[in-house]
Regions:
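Conserved N-terminal/central alpha/beta ligand/cofactor-binding core
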Residues: 6-115, 231-233, 237, 270
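Redox-cofactor binding/interface segments in oxidoreductases and associated redox assembly factors
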Residues: 14, 154-155, 393
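A glycine-rich dinucleotide-binding beta-alpha-beta segment and adjacent secondary-structure elements
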Residues: 124-126, 132, 321-405
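C-terminal structured subdomain/cap of oxidoreductase catalytic cores
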Residues: 146, 275-282, 370-431
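Short, small/polar residue-rich loop motifs at catalytic or cofactor-binding pockets
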Residues: 226-228, 366-368, 408
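Glycine-rich loop(s) and the adjacent beta-strand/alpha-helix scaffold that form part
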Residues: 142-143, 147-212, 409-412, 421, ...
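An anion/pyrophosphate-binding glycine-rich loop and adjacent beta-alpha core
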Residues: 186-190, 195-314
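Helical element adjacent to the flavin cofactor pocket in flavoenzyme catalytic cores
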Residues: 93-150, 186, 190-192, 372
């Protein structure tokens, strides 16, 4: 239960909500659904479905206020306000984990009389003589479950774990999403001949380490903190690759261009200590980090420390060029002017001491951006353009709202707002 959402840090936008007024005060009035929609369009290079984007941005405020009251969620200002957003609007839960979100929502739902069936994988749909969907059949390890319903909200997630559905764009990228994201709905809804769009689009992020072949863990909080403290990204050739304080899309694209699609974060002792603290806070254990260092750079994930020459040799970086790169960066930091990438001077900091840490950084994805086609009403559409009157979609299974590249916090924004709208539309039809 929880899908890809349960793996993230609970970040979401609060545009138009009472929650935003509480968290951001007067500054919340400077934001608007239109401003958020413009940011979405700009980030996705206008590949987004404007109708879905508008629906998302106009409803996220009410949706956040509803779930906050329904499940007693105490949202606060997110630790990181990412530069992709033109204004501070990102909030998160105290635990910085969507596990808290899913757990509390599930508890509140069952207290209201709702039922949650685990170990129940939908295998096929039930239809009447006219072809209308009347329910589903799910299989578990010990039972078959048949559910008859007049209204169905489809929130089965994406297809990132299904290698047969993955396209060229995902090649060479590590996956950190749930292994349950197998695109089941695209199989069991096949009899309806539904429209799909953008299958093969993925939300690709930087800040990953490959903990198993093809499987990643994210280091976003730690990596962002490190670059705020002045850390730099280098490639195997020992060169800097990007303005480390730029938006995530710039960093992501720069990493994809490097040898083996990999970069390295170079840190001093003071930066590593902050980096380490945030790793342990967000999904890593002290034991596994020690294990990574014990590998001494011989296999992924690469975590090494020592002198500059030692970390270069262990990580497979050109040591001579790395020294030249560091010397140049130190000069830029001292003069307050980055002559190579024009990095914001507030993030230019000299390295301290002679102990260095290097951690690999690879791009990764958990969520897919393509899916079924709907209108702003979120009813699924057939290939003939007909509206499926009693099935609504919500979350990752629907493609289009964020286009080809979503901003940070926008996948949660889409899942929460679309779920809210789909549920309201279903209730209206049932009345």
């Amino acid at each position: 239960m929880g899908g890809a959402t349960i793996l993230n840090g609970s970040n979401v936008t609060a545009t138009g909500s009472k929650t935003a007024e509480k968290v951001f005060g007067e500054n919340a009035k400077k934001d608007s659904p239109q401003k958020l929609a413009e940011d979405v369009s700009n980030e996705s290079l206008h590949t987004n479905d404007e109708n879905l984007t508008q629906m998302m941005t106009e409803n996220i405020g009410d949706a956040i206020d509803f779930i906050s009251e329904f499940a007693d969620l105490n949202y606060g200002k997110a630790q990181t306000q990412t530069p992709e957003h033109s204004i501070d609007r990102q909030i998160e839960l105290p635990s910085s984990s969507s596990y808290e979100l899913v757990k509390k929502l599930a508890e509140a739902f069952t207290k209201k009389g709702g039922q949650i069936f685990l170990d129940a994988r939908v295998e096929h749909i039930l239809q009447d003589k006219e072809g209308k969907v009347t329910g589903v059949v799910a299989e578990g390890r010990k039972r078959t479950l048949t559910v008859h319903e007049n209204a169905i909200i489809l929130s089965t997630g994406g297809y990132g774990a299904n290698l047969d559905m993955r396209g060229k764009e995902s090649q060479g990228l590590n996956y950190y999403g749930p292994q349950t994201s197998t695109g089941d709905a695209f199989q069991f809804l096949a009899p309806l001949e539904l429209q799909t769009k953008n299958i093969g689009w993925y939300k690709v992020y930087p800040h990953g380490v490959e903990v198993e072949p093809g499987i990643a863990k994210l280091t976003t909080y730690a990596s962002k903190k490190a670059t705020d403290m002045g850390a730099i990204y280098v490639n195997k050739e020992g060169h800097r690759i990007v303005d480390e304080s730029n938006v995530y899309a710039k960093l992501r694209n720069a990493v994809l261009e490097q040898t083996d699609k990999m970069a390295f974060l170079l840190m001093d002792q003071r930066t590593w200590e902050e980096f380490y603290h945030l790793l342990v806070l967000h999904d890593f254990t002290e034991e596994e980090i020690q294990h990574y260092f014990a590998n001494d750079g011989k296999k992924s994930p690469i975590f090494v420390h020592g002198s500059l020459k030692e970390v270069a040799q262990k990580a497979g970086i050109d040591a001579e060029q790395l020294q030249k790169t560091l010397n140049s960066y130190e000069k830029f930091a001292a003069q307050g002017k980055d002559e190579e990438f024009d990095r914001d001077p507030q993030f230019l900091h000299n390295y301290e001491g002679d102990e260095f840490y290097v951690v690999e950084q690879k791009d990764r994805f958990a969520t897919t951006l393509g899916g079924f086609v709907t209108g702003a009403d979120l009813n699924l559409r057939t290939k003939n353009g007909e509206r499926v009157s009693n099935i609504w979609g919500a979350g990752e299974v629907i493609g289009g709202a964020n286009g080809h590249d979503s901003m940070p916090s926008m996948m949660n924004t889409w899942s929460i707002s679309s779920g809210y709208v789909a549920a309201n539309n279903a209730l209206l039809q049932l009345k």
